[in-house]
């Protein structure tokens, strides 16, 4: 039975909310907003077994703080961000775990778009302070079942291709509170859950 990692999406949650989740056994937290997350990371340093994932949109001017404070960055979608994360990752920390965010699901059947992601993967693999772990995607929820299933099949296909090509790839971050079933069928092994964990 495969292991599923649950990321508690803790944006807009306070320190007490997160501590309650920690006491319930959650130890992976996903943050979208950098300034908010830095306050939480600082105040929760006493918990040595928790892991912080950055899951928000990345701007270039935020890469330094992300590289310094997070164990995972799930939203790397272009070369510039990878280069800056590698540059700013402190030498006394292990390489930051990186997921490539797949943005344009409509175009995944076009080899040109797949090639772009593979070029980004090759760049990340060449950088000593980055550890390529897989891909992350956020499908749009379609009312048309066929269209909906096709998105997940596309993501599964590119993930399997990455796994065959790159030995470090082992993570597909796919799935939220609204599409867990579809995501697990697409072989996701990391899901991002917010309301269903914090219940507020």
From Swiss-Prot:
Lineage: superkingdom: Bacteria
Keywords: Pyridoxal phosphate
Pfam family, one: Ala_racemase_N
Residue numbers bearing the N6-(pyridoxal phosphate)lysine modification: 11
One GO molecular-function entry: pyridoxal phosphate binding
Listed PROSITE patterns: UPF0001
NCBIfam families in alphabetical order: YggS family pyridoxal phosphate-dependent enzyme
Function as written in the Swiss-Prot or TrEMBL entry: Pyridoxal 5'-phosphate (PLP)-binding protein, which is involved in PLP homeostasis.
Sequence similarity: Belongs to the pyridoxal phosphate-binding protein YggS/PROSC family.
Quaternary context: Monomer.
Protein name: Pyridoxal phosphate homeostasis protein
Protein's organism: Buchnera aphidicola subsp. Acyrthosiphon pisum (strain APS) (Acyrthosiphon pisum symbiotic bacterium)
High-level lineage: Bacteria, Pseudomonadati, Pseudomonadota, Gammaproteobacteria, Enterobacterales
């Amino acid at each position: 039975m495969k292991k599923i990692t649950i990321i508690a999406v803790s944006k807009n949650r306070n320190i007490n909310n997160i501590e309650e989740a920690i006491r319930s056994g959650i130890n992976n937290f996903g943050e979208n907003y950098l300034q908010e997350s830095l306050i939480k990371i600082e105040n929760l340093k006493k918990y040595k077994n928790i892991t912080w994932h950055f899951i928000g949109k990345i701007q270039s001017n935020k890469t330094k703080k992300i590289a310094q404070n997070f164990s995972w960055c799930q939203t790397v979608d272009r070369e510039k961000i990878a280069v800056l994360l590698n540059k700013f990752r402190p030498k006394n920390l292990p390489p930051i775990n990186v997921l490539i965010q797949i943005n344009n699901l409509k175009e995944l059947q076009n080899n040109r778009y797949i090639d772009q992601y593979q070029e980004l993967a090759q760049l990340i693999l060449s950088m000593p302070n980055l550890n390529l772990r897989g891909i992350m995607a956020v499908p749009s929820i379609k009312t048309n079942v066929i269209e909906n299933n096709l998105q997940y099949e596309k993501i599964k296909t590119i993930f399997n291709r990455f796994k065959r090509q790159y030995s470090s790839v082992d993570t597909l971050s796919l799935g939220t509170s609204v599409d867990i079933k579809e995501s697990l069928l697409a072989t996701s092994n990391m899901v991002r859950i917010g309301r269903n964990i914090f219940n507020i």
